[in-house]
């Protein structure tokens, strides 16, 4: 993770305001991360995934990724992003050899996107998605499934894979209330998600 900051405010991840993010002295510099990855590469690590927060809110991320791809022994540098500021960087990602990008996208409905993220960035995300498909970079969608929020999107995301060269991964919502007396169990775990998919696609092979 290159930052804990994000330009969206997804309700299941963080409050809408009053956040206290880490200051610069509390996170690794790019130089420190390059040194760390170089050491790990010498030990046999060959793949690196960039995450956040939202990685692209950190200044000079793309030059940093170019440095990562140049490290001997690193065969793949991938990134997970919300896609809001991705489109303009795709040509450079392509030129440096980035082969896979994951976009975090919980709904295909613009109004519902605003309800979930509390930001009006749906058009920007979809523009990034289309540009990514056009670039030939392997594209994946990560969708967190939540009761009463985006169940209709499960089948919609599946239909997307029929027309677009994209992989979709459905993710269980992670509870943030620990495992004590106040623990709220996950209402849509992987088994329930899979069963819901099979209702519409009975010939699905797991």
Where are the model-predicted features located?
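Canonical Radical SAM [4Fe-4S] cluster-binding loop centered on the CxxxCxxC motif
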Residues: 1-30
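Acidic/polar N-terminal loop/beta-strand segments that form early-domain functional surfaces
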Residues: 3-5, 15-16, 51-53, 80-82
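A generic structural signal for secondary-structure junctions
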Residues: 15-18, 98, 117-121, 198, ...
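A short, flexible beta-alpha/helix-coil linker loop
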Residues: 17-21, 108-110, 174-178
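Short acidic, glycine/proline-rich loop/turn micro-motifs
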Residues: 22-23, 113-115, 180-181
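Radical SAM/AdoMet-radical enzyme domain recognition
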Residues: 27-50, 57-169
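A C-terminal junction/extension of Radical SAM enzymes
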Residues: 154, 160-163, 167-206
């Amino acid at each position: 993770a290159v930052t804990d900051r994000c330009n969206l405010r997804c309700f299941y991840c963080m409050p809408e305001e009053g956040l206290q993010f880490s200051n610069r002295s509390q996170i690794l510099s790019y130089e420190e991360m390059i040194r760390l990855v170089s050491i790990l590469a010498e030990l046999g690590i060959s793949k690196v995934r960039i995450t956040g927060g939202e990685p692209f809110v950190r200044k000079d991320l793309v030059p940093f990724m170019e440095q990562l791809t140049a490290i001997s022994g690193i065969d793949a540098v991938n990134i997970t992003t919300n896609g809001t500021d991705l489109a303009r960087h795709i040509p450079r990602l392509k030129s440096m050899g980035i082969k896979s990008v994951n976009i975090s996208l919980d709904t295909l409905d613009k109004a519902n996107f605003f309800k979930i993220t509390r930001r009006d960035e749906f058009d920007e995300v979809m523009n990034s998605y289309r540009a990514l498909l056009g670039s030939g970079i392997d594209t994946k969608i990560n969708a967190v499934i939540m009761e009463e929020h985006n169940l209709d999107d499960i089948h919609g995301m599946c239909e997307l894979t029929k027309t677009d060269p994209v992989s979709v991964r459905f993710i269980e919502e992670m509870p943030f209330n620990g495992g004590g007396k106040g623990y709220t169990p996950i209402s849509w775990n992987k088994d329930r998600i899979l069963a819901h998919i099979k209702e519409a696609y009975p010939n699905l092979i797991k």
